[in-house]
Amino acid sequence: TYDSAYIIAEDKYGSYGICGFYVLNKTCKTLEHFLFSCRIMNMGIEDFVFSYLEKPHINIVLPVSSFLGGTSNWIKLVDNLDLKPIEVKKQASINILFKGACDLYSVINYISGDCNIDTEFPYWNKQLIYILSHTHTAFIEQTHRLPYNKLMELTKSFPFPHPDEFKTKFFSKKYDAIILSLLTTTYRGLYINKNDRTYVEYGYANCDITDENNWDKVLSSIPEKYKEENRLLLKVFKEEYKFAGDPPVELVLKNLEYIRKNLADKTELILILGSEIPTQKALEGYEDMAKKHITLNKHVREFVKNYNNITTLELTDLIQSDDDYNECINHFSRRVYNAFAQKIIHIVNSKLGKAYLQLKEL
């Protein structure tokens, strides 16, 4: 027999919705599925659920974002916590878009005020394909620049990108501020078509899939019977695409120039720059990220000097110790997300000339 459930969480800052699920085989007391969203990192919810289930056997498949074993005695189980209905947005004075990794949800949960907030984060689509590439500056740029038919052509030769990567409201004239994180742009692998200069994105920037020396690593997670056909696909990909760089500094600056030129003049563009303080906490693909952040950030700062409607937010300034990192250089403690939100509030209010945003009251 099986016990299965999904988990809903909320705290004094807001509701996190469905943030995890499990499937417990009660006969052999084994967790067959146990998965949680990065929205609730550092809250101890996975530890609490694991303890509540009396710590059954679990086969942990690495890499993971956290390890089980904490106490989480600050969490309370209730039987009346329901999914909140989606509220119809009220007319607000300003409109804001957050675009980047999904842990930005942790920032938004601290923000309130006279605003409507839209988000464009990675997500699993209906075909259970992870839609992530759209957060890269190159995808933002080409989605606006290229006609729809050309974008759809990009989806036909290889398993990536999926058509959903090109769905966006980024260039809508309604936004008064756009918060764009450059963290995914820094660590994701970008490739340029040798003929028409279009872009596709795949994997991590530290593993160039046009380099045959990396193919065994790229194919390591694929069942043996499918490896040869995928190796042939990589050969075709190598003939058609070249690696953009790690990080692709000149290309990112070109993307940002296009983005700023094609946004409404009133839209304040706030760029999130990754932390330059090293940490020993590193998931696969995130190695040496501090050095990469230093390289890209230096050029972005110079680029921004030419504009009065672009602001940078330096995550480096928010880090006080290694405890502020959770699992890697791009995920943070609750204290950092709170400080992150305060920085956003200050920048938006200062640039728009009025205190539209505020920190949520406890």
What is each stretch, according to the model?
Residues 149-155, 190, 203-254, 281-289, ...:
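Surface-exposed cleft-lining segments at the edges of enzyme active sites
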Residues 100-101, 175-196, 270-277, 314-318:
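Short loop/turn segments at strand-loop or loop-helix junctions that form parts
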Residues 93-140, 178, 183-184:
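Catalytic nucleophile-elbow at a beta strand-turn-alpha helix junction centered on a G-D-S/GDSL motif
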Residues 276-315:
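Substrate-gating cap/lid alpha-helix
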Residues 9-12, 18-82:
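Acyl-donor binding region in acyl/amide transferases
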Residues 324-362:
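Histidine-centered active-site loop/cap adjacent to the catalytic His
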Residues 273-275, 309-326, 359-361:
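Acidic carboxylate-rich catalytic motifs and surrounding loops in phosphoryl-/glycosyl-chemistry enzymes
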Residues 51, 159-164, 242-259, 286-301, ...:
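Well-ordered, non-membrane alpha-helical segments in soluble/globular domains
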